[in-house]
From Swiss-Prot:
Binds 1 divalent metal cation per subunit. This is 5'-nucleotidase SurE. One of its GO terms (cellular component) is cytoplasm. The keyword Cell membrane does not apply. It is an enzyme of class 3 (hydrolase). Nucleotidase that shows phosphatase activity on nucleoside 5'-monophosphates. A divalent metal cation binds at D8, D9, S39, N91. Disulfide bonds: none annotated. Its main location: cytoplasm. It is found in: Cytoplasm. One of its GO terms (molecular function) is nucleotide binding. It comes from Actinobacillus succinogenes (strain ATCC 55618 / DSM 22257 / CCUG 43843 / 130Z). InterPro entries: SurE, SurE-like_Pase/nucleotidase, SurE-like_sf. Keywords: Cytoplasm, Hydrolase, Metal-binding, Nucleotide-binding.
Length: 246
């Protein structure tokens, strides 16, 4: 199996390096990842400046672009040879509920799916037990690879920051929901000019049983199928009826 591995925390992040070590026990893995932290880059592509891949000593690559750039470049003529699966992660921090709208981790997987390949995104609820998340991915790939090939979806996997043996199991979940984000943080630079920082994410608001929030809080690995089709299908008929009214 040939796996393309990317992330949004950057090539040197512990999460992607740990995952690469585990995946290379049974697969051919090439990393194409950002050269720096590009968290919350979402699915943005770089269009106004060139992308500059830099090959590293172990034949992996880091790029001066976003996670989506990395996967797009890798699969659209940069890499030679077949790729069977795109894996993104391990992210330092969860991607639950509304986090998926901003996540570069999810975006790398979605770009792979958009370009016709099965894809998985994996995140850890912390910064300690990356090996637990890596083992979960290695457990799941043999089970799910065939099914993923038939699907237009990606899998969003979130792992509690616990030792592998303390994880309670796997749960297939829907996305939960966060409250609105906190206000931006206003400061002043050394010249007295106003600068702003994006504030913290909102707290979980819909964390009921059956959500990804609830599963991770209870010590389970959450698995949520994500589709790139953003159409609100349930609203099509009512919207058409509204437009036809005199």
């Amino acid at each position: 199996m040939n796996i393309l591995l990317s992330n949004d925390d950057g090539y040197h992040a512990e999460g992607i390096q740990t995952l690469a070590t585990y995946l290379r026990k049974f697969a051919n893995v090439v990393i194409v990842a950002p050269d720096r932290n590009r968290s919350a880059a979402s699915s943005s592509l770089t269009l106004v400046e060139p992308l500059r891949p830099r090959q590293l000593d172990n034949r992996d690559y880091c790029i001066n672009g976003t996670p989506a750039d990395c996967v797009h470049l890798a699969l659209n003529g940069f890499l030679s040879g077949r790729v069977d699966l795109v894996v993104s992660g391990i992210n330092a921090g969860v991607n639950l509920g509304d986090d998926t709208l901003y996540s570069g981790t999810l975006a790398a997987a979605l770009e792979g799916r958009h370009l016709g390949l099965p894809a998985i995104a994996v995140s850890l609820d912390g910064r300690q037990h990356y090996e637990s998340a890596a083992k979960i991915v290695c457990d799941l790939i043999p089970k799910l690879h065939g099914q993923l090939l038939k699907s237009r979806e990606i899998l969003n996997i979130n792992v509690p920051d616990l030792p592998y043996e303390n994880l309670k199991g796997l749960k297939v979940c829907r996305l939960g929901h966060r409250s609105s984000a906190a206000e931006v943080i206003k400061q002043a630079d050394p010249r007295g000019e106003a600068i702003y920082w994006i504030g913290p994410a909102g707290l979980p608001e819909d964390e009921a049983e059956g959500t990804d929030f609830h599963a991770v809080q209870q010590g389970y690995v959450s698995i949520t199928p994500i589709q790139p089709d953003l159409t609100a299908h349930h609203s099509l008929r009512s919207l058409q009826t509204w437009l036809e009214q005199e």
